[in-house]
Design a protein with these regions (language model features):
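Arginine/glycine-rich "motif VI" loop of SF2 helicases in the C-terminal RecA-like domain
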Residues: 1-5
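Conserved RNA-binding domains used in RNP assembly and mRNA/RNA metabolism
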Residues: 6-10, 14-15, 21-135
């Protein structure tokens, strides 16, 4: 969700975090996890049939799933909504290095991005910064 996903299907349940990482690495070799962040912030979403993708992944990685004793989950698709009043037509990236003081009306939050009327800021990129917020 912190990447701005609008829907998801849980695939597997594993015994621990380490196993989760190992399975994820194998699946990621075939299934890209790249999101065009500018399109995502404009809400220009490419529709994907997650049930078809799920079935392909489970079939292709059946050995990995079996070797790691992962339990295949039979769950529904989850949809996510974000508090956004207005999506930008053009995405202008803001950051505290170039602009130490950012002013403007906050019109939305999507994942790790704060959307202002005049630009967006990836707040995770600025973790550890001390900021002052006035409203």
């Amino acid at each position: 969700m912190d990447q701005g996903a609008y829907k998801a299907i849980p695939l597997l349940e594993v015994k621990d975090r380490k196993t989760s990482g190992m399975v994820e690495i194998e699946i990621a070799k075939e299934l890209g996890d790249k999101t065009n962040w500018r399109k995502m912030l404009k809400n220009d979403i490419e529709e994907v049939d997650l049930l078809k993708v799920r079935d392909k992944v489970l079939k292709k990685f059946s050995k990995v799933i079996e070797q790691n004793k992962a339990e295949v989950l039979d769950v529904k698709e989850y949809m996510f909504e974000y508090p956004v009043e207005q999506y930008p037509e053009k995405v202008k990236s803001l950051n505290f290095e170039k602009t130490p003081e950012i002013k403007g009306k906050l019109v939305g939050i999507k994942g790790q991005y704060l959307i202002f009327e005049h630009g967006v800021i990836n707040i995770r990129r600025h973790q550890g910064y001390e900021i002052e917020l006035d409203y």
